């Protein structure tokens, strides 16, 4: 049963992540933020919403200080990865290039898990991961990749991918020696602490007044986004605690597939209802119809990859 549960939670995490990524695209196009550290701060500090659950589920300490420290480090690595991701989004804005490079996480996590955790999968599972990786790359290329941006974008995205992969492997190591709740709670402490550190040490003073005003005026909007983000992380982390982290990251590579369907839905909604905030996303949504034949083949490959990693 746990084999099915980790898959379902990983799938839910990918779906929620797709919604959050589309909202991130909207925020970039609407120029809500002025500096890439600003969405990093919001993403980090508002994860403190999890602490509201403490009166109901209680506080639980990991099995040792070493495990607790590893969980916190994993959270810090997570928020650091998001900073480099947002830096690329704000500096270049070409989501096809960014998505293509982010898909390297599918390859990075199995390597890191093999080296650091000794995680071993069978041949069919590795082949399934390969198909998901190839399919995810094909989805990115179907939208047209500006290869001229690759040298400039790669140096930041490779750092983001490495940090996120290391974060996931750290979390899996924590779950091998602790309960889900204690590991996730201290991982969350690292994320929130990283967000606070981003504000204190990395947000230039000339941006702070505008950031404060933006945060106040859009607080409820941010609250909704980060609640979704928290729900996605909850599902992803629960999947990691139940199944191999390599397979969890592979299933989460289905996020571009969810983006295709969600963006297509938003496109048709925008045609039916003249809502300005929906119409802002129309150009991005329209891009999802480019290279549809290639995308169909890519999604078929990914579906077969999912079948292979679920063969047991």
Where are these regions (language model features)?
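Polytopic alpha-helical membrane proteins, predominantly small-molecule transporters/carriers
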Residues: 1-312
């Amino acid at each position: 049963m746990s084999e099915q549960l980790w898959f379902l939670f990983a799938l839910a995490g990918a779906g929620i992540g797709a919604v959050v990524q589309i909202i991130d695209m909207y925020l970039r196009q609407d120029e809500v933020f002025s500096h890439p550290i600003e969405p990093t701060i919001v993403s980090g500090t508002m994860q403190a919403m999890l602490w509201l659950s403490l009166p109901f589920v209680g506080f639980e300490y990991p099995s040792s200080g070493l495990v607790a420290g590893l969980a916190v480090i994993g959270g810090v690595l997570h928020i650091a990865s998001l900073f480099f991701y947002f830096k690329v989004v704000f500096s270049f804005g070409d989501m096809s290039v960014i998505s293509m490079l982010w898909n390297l996480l599918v390859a990075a996590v199995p390597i890191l898990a093999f080296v650091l955790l000794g995680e071993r999968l069978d041949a069919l599972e590795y082949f399934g991961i390969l198909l998901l990786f190839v399919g995810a790359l094909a989805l990115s290329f179907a939208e047209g990749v500006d290869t001229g941006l690759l040298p400039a974008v790669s140096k930041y995205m490779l750092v983001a991918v490495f940090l996120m992969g290391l974060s996931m492997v750290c979390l899996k190591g924590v779950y091998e020696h602790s309960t889900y709740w204690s590991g996730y709670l201290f991982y969350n402490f690292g994320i929130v602490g990283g967000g606070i550190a981003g504000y204190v040490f990395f947000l230039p003073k000339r941006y702070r007044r505008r950031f404060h005003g933006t945060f106040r005026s859009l607080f409820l909007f941010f609250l909704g986004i980060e609640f979704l983000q928290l729900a996605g992380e909850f599902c992803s982390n629960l999947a990691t605690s139940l199944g191999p982290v390599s397979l969890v990251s592979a299933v989460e590579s289905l996020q571009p597939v969810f983006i295709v369907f969600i963006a297509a839905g938003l496109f048709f909604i925008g045609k039916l209802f003249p809502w300005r905030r929906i119409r802002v996303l129309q150009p991005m949504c329209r891009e999802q119809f480019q290279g549809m034949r290639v995308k169909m083949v890519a999604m078929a490959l990914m579906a077969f990859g999912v079948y292979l990693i679920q063969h047991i």
